[in-house]
């Protein structure tokens, strides 16, 4: 697959998330990018994007501030925490095998079961190998000259990618 085909395929896969057609046509020396995409967040959206992009042949790094996957279901462990939508809405539909491997115990699952499902997904598709945990992102900057994102972490590390996907969710900042 040539560079233009890869760029079109990547913009198609992640287009609904953050990329416009204009953004997918960036000019410049993108060879300076360490990854095709840097994803911030390893909740359900971040894991889904990692799975989809990896299966399309793209190099991906996920940065997660916690020490495991699950997003809001990792952080919110208070007694009685549960989803307010049917548990099936948390089920990924991209794999029939995955759907047949998991059976929700109740219509509106509690936090422990949803977190178990997130861990099952991470294990089933070996997602953790591309996730760097305990990495709090402090900034994401786009260099228009070379068409590369630099995502900086609190530790001082920088990660570069042709694309940056913010999968932090609406519950990632306390209020």
Language-model segment annotations:
Residues 19, 28-38, 69-83:
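Accessory recognition modules or surfaces
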Residues 54-75:
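Glycine-rich FAD pyrophosphate-binding loop
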Residues 74-116:
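Glycine-rich active-site loop/strand segments that organize a redox cofactor
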Residues 70-71, 172-175:
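Short catalytic/ligand-binding loop motif for oxyanion handling, primarily in non-cytosolic enzymes
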Residues 1-37, 55:
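Extreme N-terminal leader/targeting segments of oxidoreductases
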Residues 37-61:
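N-terminal Rossmann-like FAD-binding beta1-loop-alpha1 element of flavoenzymes
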Residues 106-172:
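Feature captures the FAD/FMN-dependent oxidoreductase FAD-binding
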């Amino acid at each position: 697959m040539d560079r233009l085909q890869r760029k079109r395929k990547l913009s198609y896969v992640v287009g609904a998330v953050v990329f416009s057609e204009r953004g997918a046509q960036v000019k410049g020396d993108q060879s300076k990018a360490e990854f095709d995409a840097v994803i911030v967040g390893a909740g359900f959206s971040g894991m889904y994007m990692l799975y989809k992009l990896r299966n399309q042949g793209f190099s991906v790094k996920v940065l997660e501030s916690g020490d495991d996957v699950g997003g809001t279901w990792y952080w919110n462990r208070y007694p009685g925490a549960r989803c307010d939508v049917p548990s099936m809405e948390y089920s990924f539909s991209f794999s029939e095998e995955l759907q047949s491997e998991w059976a929700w115990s109740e219509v509106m699952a509690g936090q422990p079961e949803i977190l178990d499902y997130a861990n099952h997904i991470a294990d089933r598709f070996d997602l953790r190998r591309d996730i760097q945990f305990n990495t709090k992102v402090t900034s994401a900057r786009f260099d228009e000259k070379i068409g590369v994102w630099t995502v900086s972490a609190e530790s001082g590390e920088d990660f570069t990618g042709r694309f940056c996907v913010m999968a932090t969710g609406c519950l990632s900042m306390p209020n």
